[in-house]
Amino acid sequence: MVDFAFELRKVQDTGKLVMGAKKSIHYAKVGGAKMIIVAKNARPDIKEDIYYYAKLSGIPVYEFEGTSVELGTLLGRPHTVSALAVIDPGESRILALAGGKE
């Protein structure tokens, strides 16, 4: 089983990710993301856009079971993070969470 927190930190250290709903929606629209992670309590309109555009682009979406505050804390940020896009997973196995290609 893949440990989300561990793999997310690994992406931060060895790969590339972008934080924020607007940027995540952008990457869902144009492609370029390997995976998008959205917090369980993200606004419904944000979740709807992310799921819609990610489906069109063939990008897997993982819904984080915690809140945007908890997601921000996992990333070491002093603010909420409702969504993020994984551009390069680096050495992590985070793509396995959403059934993406590792």
UniProtKB/Swiss-Prot annotation:
It comes from the Archaea. Keywords: Ribonucleoprotein, Ribosomal protein. Pfam families: Ribosomal_L7Ae (PF01248). InterPro entries: Ribosomal_eL30, Ribosomal_eL30-like, Ribosomal_eL30-like_sf, Ribosomal_eL30_CS, Ribosomal_eL8/eL30/eS12/Gad45. GO terms for biological process: translation. GO terms for molecular function: RNA binding; structural constituent of ribosome. The keyword Heme does not apply. The keyword Ribosomal protein applies. GO terms for cellular component: cytosolic large ribosomal subunit. HAMAP family: Ribosomal_eL30. Belongs to the eukaryotic ribosomal protein eL30 family. This is Large ribosomal subunit protein eL30. The lineage of its organism: Archaea, Methanobacteriati, Methanobacteriota, Thermococci, Thermococcales.
